[in-house]
Amino acid sequence: MDSNHQSNYKLSKTEKKLLRKQIKARHTLLRHEGIETVSYATQSLIVANGGLGNQVSRNQLLPVLEKCGLVDALLMPPNKPYSCVRYKTVEESKTAYDTLNGKEIVDDLGQKIILYLNFVEKAQWKELGLQALPPGLKVIEEIISSEDEKMLLESVNWTEDTENQNFQKSLKHRRVKHFGYEFHYENNNVDKDKPLPGGLPDICESILEKWLKEGFIKHKPDQLTINQYEPGHGIPAHIDTHSAFEDEIISLSLGSEIVMDFKHPDGMTVPVMLPCRSLLVMTGESRYLWTHGITPRKFDTVQASKGHKSGIITSDVEDLTLNKRGIRTSFTFRKVRQTPCNCSYPLVCDSQMKETPASFPESDKEALQLEQDYVHRVYEEIARHFSSTRHTPWPHIVEFLKALPSGSLVADIGCGNGKYLGINNELYMIGCDHSQNLVDICRERQYQAFVCDALAVPIRSGSCDACISIAVIHHFATAERRVAALQELVRLLRPGGKALIYVWAMEQEYNKKKSKYLRENRTSQGMKEEISNDASVQELLVKQLPNVGNQDSAHSVSSINDFQDGGCNSKNVANSKLPIHTNRTSFHSQDLLVPWHFKGNPGKDKRVEPFGPLGSRDPGPVFHRYYHVFCEGELEAACRTLNNISILQSYYDQGNWCVILQKV
């Protein structure tokens, strides 16, 4: 809607709303992408809400655009909620602008979305150079016939008697069967002393012999895991344990194609299309050094020109579209290793890594490493699943934000998926988090967020009217670092500014009332015992934890000691390993590792607790996060070590200690 048109007559209510949406789209593009729109007509238009990130495919959008003229190019960057169309003439572009602005279409999920268009001079995206498959990786297409595929799928009896040791284990939107040895997802390993009876299915034996004879594989596997995935399910990025299996790991895709992501430790990610009836073979560097995983989603970004052919998904924005996932069944074969691994990648090899006892960090460097391994890396892995469980804002936090004056600048330090950034539209809110994947989710929701360390926030001192820190400070591994995080919050505040802080409480039963975390105990007693007494998990964590000292960091700042006279009923854990907490039970130590059970299809996992993870009966991957849970009075004591604040209020809220402080 141009300015000349606006000046001729008074805008209707609908036109005003459309104009507001257009302006918002312009600001979002400029803030997040650096794309400037213009007020005059050009050949190019940015189509807000018409992107792959909105589940709008090329095949769906292009016919709509072509009704207005000859489309010269349609650029659809991956994971972005917009696209750019270039018409042959300016007149055709103007026609599209007038016709399609505010047009409602239905995306590939059946949801209604509205398109908003703005003119641009040019739109550019960074193009990644041509990528190669990770070394040692190959994909063999059509390795079996459609008849063999049908026989393999029909051979899997998902309803057999549970007395058979090969019976399936049902996960949410996923079923699993094991042959040869049971694959343990909590440590990506097998128990070599407990082979399953019967070996591999007969139908697989003949196929494997054929692959060996034709040179597709080098070893005959003795372990098979069959997974059936519903659309929307994923696999967290991982490396199969070095000491458990030989160099070669192979996976046969049946029923549907999928895009699998391979990631190098330097951060480079290579998405690879695995067609139906193709065999993925991982050897060497691709098996030992690169992680592999599948992002949980219902649509994959693929190249329109390649269809379902194998290969790398490039960043050619003129050739990207969406491909709807189907039900995929994977047959993953491995050869169990009987000797320690002596690969060329000792830094990620459990056979070659130095075993060190787990204790508590006595230096800032060791604390930083603990946080890196058991906070930051974990949140990057579980970000999508974690986000799906964080959807309901807490009333007292909402109350705090609603009470702030209109126009206040508020920083959410450790914003996660941004669920508090849109609570009060009269505030100017910005968020930050250490996790790139969580910040990406914020941006997908059109929130302003950036990546940073909570101990060094790149915001000018004294510029914020308020700050919130929800479930962040309990992840710092020493008292000094927790106090430093509080000091950083105060630094951001103007004089008179307020901060709201939430941390997980040691006391999950308070005033004779259990917290939601305890009340909503969905784990069986058997599962509790499995988690808390699993020696193999404890041993694995001992191997991975940094070499740390024996100081109990909860007492390393003397002024925080005063609050504890008879108050905190925790065990003395100095000179001990970090204990693994049993989910949905009371805490017995202030410093501990809390399991997070990764589940499938994050969009449908409804949970109500704010900070604590949920136990699971599913044998899915388990991640462990470091926590320091706070005793009553400890948070206030830490705040009082700061010399420029006053505590306005402190309270207990569903298993969390909370403070509102003001900068003086």
Swiss-Prot record:
Residues 411-664 are annotated as: Methyltransferase domain. 2-oxoglutarate binds at residues 227-229, 328, 334. Pfam families: 2OG-FeII_Oxy_2 (PF13532), ALKBH8_N (PF09004), Methyltransf_11 (PF08241), RRM_1 (PF00076). It comes from the Eukaryota. CDD domains: AdoMet_MTases, RRM_ALKBH8. It is found in: Cytoplasm; Nucleus. One of its GO terms (cellular component) is cytosol. Zn(2+) binds at residues 242, 341, 343, 349. Keywords: Cytoplasm, Iron, Metal-binding, Methyltransferase, Multifunctional enzyme, Nucleus, RNA-binding, S-adenosyl-L-methionine, Transferase, Zinc. GO terms for molecular function: 2-oxoglutarate-dependent dioxygenase activity; iron ion binding; S-adenosylmethionine-dependent methyltransferase activity; tRNA (5-carboxymethyluridine(34)-5-O)-methyltransferase activity; tRNA (uridine) methyltransferase activity; tRNA binding; zinc ion binding. Residues 220-337 form the Fe2OG dioxygenase domain. Its EC number is 2.1.1.229. Residues 43-120 form the RRM domain. GO terms for biological process: DNA damage response; tRNA methylation; tRNA wobble uridine modification. Signal peptide: none annotated. Its cofactor is Fe(2+). Binds 1 Fe(2+) ion per subunit. Its main location: cytoplasm. Fe cation binds at residues 238, 240, 292. PROSITE patterns: FE2OG_OXY. It catalyses: 5-(carboxymethyl)uridine(34) in tRNA + S-adenosyl-L-methionine = 5-(2-methoxy-2-oxoethyl)uridine(34) in tRNA + S-adenosyl-L-homocysteine. InterPro entries: AlkB-like, AlkB_hom8_N, AlkB_tRNA_MeTrf/Diox, ALKBH8_RRM, Methyltransf_11, Nucleotide-bd_a/b_plait_sf, Oxoglu/Fe-dep_dioxygenase_dom, RBD_domain_sf. Interacts with TRMT112. Catalyzes the methylation of 5-carboxymethyl uridine to 5-methylcarboxymethyl uridine at the wobble position of the anticodon loop in tRNA via its methyltransferase domain. Catalyzes the last step in the formation of 5-methylcarboxymethyl uridine at the wobble position of the anticodon loop in target tRNA. Has a preference for tRNA(Arg) and tRNA(Glu), and does not bind tRNA(Lys). Belongs to the alkB family. This is tRNA (carboxymethyluridine(34)-5-O)-methyltransferase ALKBH8. It comes from Bos taurus. The gene is ALKBH8.
